Amino acid sequence: MNRGQADMKQPLLKLEQVEICYRRTPVVHGLTLEVAPGEILGIVGESGSGKSTVIKGIIGLLGNEGAVTEGKIYYKGEELLHGTPEELRNIRGPEMGMVFQNAGASLCPIRKIGDQLYEAVLQHERVSRTEVRRRAMELFEKMKLSEGS
């Protein structure tokens, strides 16, 4: 199979018995689902029910306090939970991302903006940390923010 092309016979996305923990506390239990190529999936639920946590687990944005601790996640037949950050970026590519339902809550208020921007760019682009830092500094200057923001 060519990377980046989904086989119409296999799921585009597949989760098998996924468990996600935050600070060692399980918050998502035994999640199993399949999304076929061309299929649309909507995740709905009450506030705090784990919608964003599931998406962050799939795309690898749980941060230092969260982790997928059980199960398997596949995208186009390739496992997303193992491999180097570079290998995982290549699998996910620019196709995976997250759209926040509340733009005001998109950034974590207790973490530095710069750290959050660095993580997002490093997660999805094939650039060096030096290049990420350079781009972030340009953005900070345009927004009249200091690097420590």
What kind of region is each of these model predictions?
Residues 80-97, 123, 129:
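ABC ATPase NBD coupling module
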Residues 13, 28-30, 91:
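Conserved structural motif at the start of ABC-family nucleotide-binding domains
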